[in-house]
Amino acid sequence: MSIETQHRKKDPVRLYRQLLESAATIAGRDGIAALSLNAVAYEAGVSKGGLLHHFPNKQALIFALFARLLAIMEDAISTLMTADTTSYGRFTRAYLHYLSAPELTDTQESRQLMVLSLAMPDEPVLRKCWRDWMLAHLAQGDELDNSHTGTLVRYAADGIWLSELTEGRTMSAEHRQALVETLYNMTLPT
């Protein structure tokens, strides 16, 4: 047996990602209550000490997982905003498009984000992270993004996304599409 096979080469970046993937898997599969440091270490195939090197407690792990999912969402929304040629209401439209995309509901990413979103009332750090993210977008947003209409459209998008994740699809595809189109049209300049 070579020395290489006897000792795993240390790669802290890879281990960090592996731990977050394991945490995401557990959160999406079993919920936030099942997300313990022992469970994540076991899922990742590392010692608890290896996990504690990166995440000193459960809150740090949950925050890192939420930040990772928020970064994925940020990338997708930024891509949608860049592709949108109409500047008026661009953020709200991208937010609506991202959360109302039917294919998002069926992803592990969406399930993980839902689990962490539902944990926000009990996790002030997550609430602050989400609030800061939203306020940063609104600070860069325009009149529509900061209006009652923009808020209504984003809250409706949240509702569509969350209801499909928690209740399944309760409206026909046609009804859903008409609802999303109505919301989309509310974001366009008149």
Language model features with spans:
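Hydrophobic/aromatic-rich alpha-helical bundle segments in the mid-to-C-terminal region
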Residues: 106-107, 124-190
